[in-house]
Regions:
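Basic, flexible linker segments flanking DNA-binding modules
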Residues: 1-48, 149, 205-218
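C-terminal domain-tail junction helix/linker
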Residues: 129, 133-140, 161-225
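An active-site-proximal beta-strand-loop segment
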Residues: 42, 46-84
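Hydrophobic (often cysteine-bearing) scaffold residues that line and stabilize catalytic clefts
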Residues: 2, 32, 36, 50-51, ...
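Acidic/histidine-rich, metal-coordinating catalytic segments
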Residues: 110-127, 146-150, 201-207
């Protein structure tokens, strides 16, 4: 059936197609702040956990106005190790996601973040003095793709699209940020623990990949006689 025929019949029935809604610009270029080199060069793989993180945030419409969700993802397993929601897209917002990632991987998980590569776009939040200073504190090396190139941060962009497709456009809009935060927490738990990932061996969920890695790389102490 021709598209024009479909549109005419939908109008007659008072129906409209599902759309992604109005686009909101979330990346503001950093002015005056040093810009790190691109250390990934579109290689979104990692040999083990805590070697490469990618970050980004996206907008989410609610009945109270636009809110924003930031993610930190480990490229080894595609696990979301940190996230945050906010009604403002400022540095404190993305720092919240970073702090959760540091707590998850280092403080709670006992991992070593020294030499980890943190990859972002040129958003002013990620290149701010407060944010980059926090990376330095943890021995994390900053990396950023070219200005305006979504391909240079494709893994993080893909995560945002999954979040929008699997949660935001399916179940939203929500009343306010509190409702969005609750829904996002549930989605992240499902994403990490249950959802199959085509980039992982056997399409395994992120936590399963990491459990398998940790099991295979646990050093067994020698038996004493």
């Amino acid at each position: 059936m021709a598209r024009c025929t479909v549109e005419r019949r939908m109008r007659a029935l008072g129906l409209t197609g599902a759309g992604a809604g109005r686009t909101v610009r979330t990346t503001g270029p950093a002015k005056g702040n040093p810009v790190p080199d691109d250390l990934l060069r579109r290689d979104f793989t990692a040999a083990r956990p805590n070697r490469r993180w990618v970050v980004d945030f996206t907008y989410v419409p609610t009945w109270s106005g636009f809110c924003y969700t930031a993610f930190v993802m480990d490229l080894f397993s595609r696990r979301i190790v940190g996230w945050a929601t906010s009604s403002r897209m400022d540095t404190d917002f993305v720092l919240g996601a970073l702090e959760q990632a540091i707590w998850t991987r280092k403080d709670r998980g006992g991992g070593d973040l020294e030499g980890l590569v943190h990859h972002s776009d040129h958003g002013s939040q990620y290149l701010s003095i407060a944010y980059t200073g926090r990376l330095v504190d943890e021995g994390i090396e900053a990396s950023a793709g070219a200005v305006g190139s979504s391909y240079d941060n494709a893994a993080a962009e893909a995560l945002n699209k999954s979040y929008k497709r699997e949660l935001v456009w399916r179940d939203g809009p929500w009343k306010d940020r509190d409702d969005l935060e609750t829904a996002t927490a549930q989605w992240v738990n499902w994403y990490n623990r249950t959802r199959p990932h085509l980039t992982n061996d056997d399409d395994l969920p992120p936590t399963t990949v990491e459990h398998r890695y940790n099991h295979n790389h646990t050093t067994t102490p020698p038996t004493t006689v």
